Amino acid sequence: SPEQANVLIHRQRPARRQVAGVWRASNGRTQLQVVDVQRQGRRRLEPLVKVMVSPGLRAEALQATALHELGHAFGLWGHSSVPTDVLAISQGERPVLVPSQRDRLTLEWVMQQTTRFGSTLRKPIEPAESESPE
């Protein structure tokens, strides 16, 4: 259910945003919010990730954009300089529809890192919000 999900996917065009003084549109965007929740009698930190993908894209571009944004949702916040990676900074002529070996290895590394998500909290935590660089 959406109330329990950590990742919510929306078919909506992300708002344009200003980058280095220039307004830019994008096919997708991911926003991370760290929330203080109460579950099973315990307070803990959980990620709440909103993924937005423009609905008007052709099928391959929509799939590639969704895969790229899900990479951000799963913790890959940076971009790759290699155009054949899902997390390449922009889609080339041929959208990447399958994660590369580099993408998979990076995700495996991220998943092995320690996190405070799920830990019991004793003091209130101020919410934080972050947005992917596209």
What kind of feature is each model-predicted range?
Residues 114-115, 119-134:
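Pan-zinc metallopeptidase signature
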Residues 88-118:
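Post-HExxH zinc-binding segment in Zn-dependent metallohydrolases
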Residues 8, 49-53, 84-96:
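Surface-exposed aromatic
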